[in-house]
Swiss-Prot record:
Annotated CDD domains: RuBisCO_large_I
Quaternary organization: Heterohexadecamer of 8 large chains and 8 small chains.
Protein species of origin: Nitrobacter hamburgensis (strain DSM 10229 / NCIMB 13809 / X14)
PROSITE patterns named in the record: RUBISCO_LARGE
UniProt-recorded name of the protein: Ribulose bisphosphate carboxylase large chain 2
Length: 488
C-alpha cells in the first residue's frame, strides 16, 4: 500500500497564532506521527482535491474544517485545549486504481462529540466540509466508533433474538412483501392485499416509503384495514403475522399519534423512513423501546448520497449510524435484485447489522475493527426485484437472519397474491430443508426448486414467469482493494 509520507509541518509556539492565513498542515491538522487513542473516533474519507491542490493539504483541510479550524488563524484558539481538540489527519493513501483520489485517515478526540447524538456527530463529520472549494469531491467511506462512544447509545429497541421469539420463527429468513401498487389503492383494497399475502405464507407485509396519508387513503383507514387483515390471517394460519405500518409524517406529534394508534390496534411493528432525519429516528426508537414495538426503517433517500463512488457517505457508515440510533430493521441490499448492491460490499453492510464485532475486511469495504459492545443486532432487509427463482442465491449471499421481501414477486404472480406468497414460502422451505440436510443447495438450487414445484403449482408458475429475469449491471460501489467475483 503506497502511503504518502510527509513529516509534520506544524508551527508551534507564538508563531502558530499570528494573525493571517496559514496552511492547514502548518496549523496542526496533519500529524503523521500521531497514534490514535482507543477512545478516538476515526473517519476514513475519500478525498479528491482540485487540480494543483496538494493531497496532504486537502486531507488536513478536511480534518480542520470538520473540527476546530476556520479559514484564518483566530486568537481564541489559545483559550481552548487546541492540541487536544484539533482533528488529526495521520495517514494519506492513494486510492488503488483511482487516479487523483486519496484515502485520508482522520482521528477526532471523543470530547468533540455530544454523547448519544447522531445529529451532533454528523454535524461535524459531514457538515460544512463537503462544500469546501479546494475539493472536487469528498466521501465518508468508513468510521471507527470507540466502545466508550457506542455505549452512550441505546441501539435497536428489540433486536433479532427477541424479534424471533415474539414471532416464534427460527432457523430461516423471514418473508415479506411490499404492497403494490405503492400508491392509489383504497384502504379496503389495500387490506385485501395484506390478507392474501399473509394467508399465503408470508410473515410480514409492508407499506412503501411514500405511502403516508394521501387523499386516496388516509393513514387511519389504512391502519384499520391492515390490522383487520393481520388478525384474520393469524386466525387462518395459526402464525404470528405483522404489517409494517408507516408512521412517517410531517411532525413528530403526528408520528407519535400514528404510532400510538398502531399500538392500540395490536400491531407488533411500525415503520419510518430515513428521510425523517436522525433526531426523529432516535426519537421514534425511544418510543419503540418504551412500547415494546419493532422499528422498521426504510432507507428512502439514501442513494442521493451513498450511490456515487467519489462523493457522499457510504451506506456502511449509514448502517453504523442507524445501529447506534436504534432501528430493528434496515434495508441493506439484495445482491441479485434491481437495486445497487455489489456482493462483497453488501456482505459488509450485513455484517455491520448482525455481528457483535466487525473485523477489518478490506474485501468487504470495512476498514476498521468495530466492537458493538452490548448493542442489539439489526435485522437487514432484502427488497427490490427479487423472486422465488433466486432463493438459493439469496440464502447463499444473505444468510438466514434477514427479511426477504418479495413485492412484485408476490403480488405480480399470475395466479394471484395468495399464490405468489405460497410460491415464495414453498421455495424458502425447500431450500432451507436442503441446506439442513447438508446438500449443496447453491449448485443444486434450480433442481431443488424444480422438484418442489412439481407438487406446488404456484411455485411452478412463478419459476416459469420470472425464469429469465436478472439484473446484472456493473456496481458503482465496489471494494477498492479486491475485484468482486461475478454473481453465480
Amino acid at each position: 500500500m503506497n502511503v504518502l509520507n510527509e513529516k509534520s509541518l506544524t508551527v508551534r509556539g507564538k508563531d502558530r497564532y499570528k494573525s493571517g492565513v496559514m496552511s492547514y498542515k502548518k496549523m496542526g491538522y496533519w500529524e503523521p506521527d500521531y497514534t490514535p487513542k482507543d477512545t478516538d473516533i476515526i473517519c476514513l474519507f475519500r478525498v479528491t482535491p482540485q487540480d494543483g491542490v496538494d493531497p496532504i493539504e486537502a486531507a488536513a483541510a478536511v480534518a480542520g474544517e470538520s473540527s476546530t479550524a476556520t479559514w484564518t488563524v483566530v486568537w481564541t484558539d489559545r483559550l481552548t485545549a487546541a492540541e487536544k481538540y484539533r482533528a488529526k489527519c495521520y495517514r494519506v493513501d492513494p486510492v488503488p486504481g483511482a487516479e487523483g483520489q486519496y484515502f485520508a485517515y482522520i482521528a477526532y478526540d471523543l470530547d468533540l462529540f455530544e454523547p448519544g447524538s447522531i445529529s451532533n456527530l454528523t454535524a461535524s463529520v459531514i457538515g460544512n466540509v463537503f462544500g469546501f472549494k479546494p475539493l472536487k469531491a469528498l466521501r465518508l467511506e468508513d468510521m471507527r466508533l470507540p466502545v466508550a462512544y457506542v455505549k452512550t447509545f441505546k441501539g435497536p429497541p428489540t433486536g433479532i433474538v427477541v424479534e424471533r421469539e415474539r414471532l416464534d420463527k427460527f432457523g430461516r429468513p423471514l418473508l415479506g412483501a411490499t404492497v403494490k401498487p405503492k400508491l392509489g389503492l383504497s384502504g379496503r383494497n389495500y387490506g385485501r392485499v395484506v390478507y392474501e399475502a399473509l394467508k399465503g405464507g408470508l410473515d410480514f407485509t409492508k407499506d412503501d416509503e411514500n405511502i403516508n396519508s394521501q387523499p386516496f387513503m388516509h393513514w387511519r383507514e389504512r391502519f384499520l384495514y391492515c390490522m383487520e387483515a393481520v388478525n384474520r390471517a393469524q386466525a387462518a394460519t395459526g402464525e404470528i403475522k405483522g404489517s409494517y405500518l408507516n408512521v412517517t409524517a410531517a411532525t413528530m406529534e403526528d408520528m407519535y399519534e400514528r404510532a400510538e394508534f398502531a399500538k392500540e390496534l395490536g400491531s407488533v411493528v411500525v415503520m419510518i423512513d430515513l428521510v425523517i432525519g436522525y433526531t426523529a429516528i432516535q426519537s421514534m426508537s425511544n418510543w419503540a423501546r418504551k412500547n415494546d414495538m419493532i422499528l422498521h426503517l426504510h432507507r428512502a433517500g439514501h442513494s442521493t448520497y451513498t450511490r456515487q463512488r467519489n462523493h457522499g457517505v457510504s451506506f456502511r457508515v449509514i448502517s453504523k449510524w442507524m445501529r447506534l440510533a436504534g432501528v430493528d430493521h434496515i434495508h441493506a441490499g439484495t445482491v441479485v435484485g434491481k437495486l445497487e448492491g455489489d456482493p462483497l460490499t453488501t456482505r459488509g453492510y450485513y455484517d455491520i447489522c448482525r455481528e457483535e464485532h466487525n473485523p477489518m475486511q478490506l474485501e468487504h469495504g470495512i476498514f476498521f475493527d468495530q466492537n458493538w459492545a452490548s448493542l442489539n443486532k439489526m435485522m437487514p432487509v432484502a427488497s427490490g426485484g427479487i423472486h422465488a427463482g433466486q432463493m438459493h442465491q439469496l440464502i447463499q449471499h444473505l444468510g438466514e437472519d434477514v427479511v426477504l421481501q418479495f413485492g412484485g414477486g408476490t403480488i405480480g404472480h399470475p395466479m394471484g397474491i395468495q399464490a405468489g406468497a405460497t410460491a415464495n414460502r414453498v421455495a424458502l422451505e425447500a431450500m432451507i430443508l436442503a441446506r439442513n440436510e447438508g446438500r449443496d443447495y447453491v449448485s443444486e438450487g434450480p433442481d431443488i426448486l424444480a422438484k418442489a414445484a412439481a407438487s406446488c403449482t404456484p411455485l411452478k408458475q412463478a419459476l416459469e414467469v420470472w425464469k429469465d429475469v436478472t439484473f446484472n449491471y456493473q456496481s458503482t460501489d465496489a471494494p477498492d482493494y479486491v475485484t468482486t467475483p461475478a454473481v453465480a
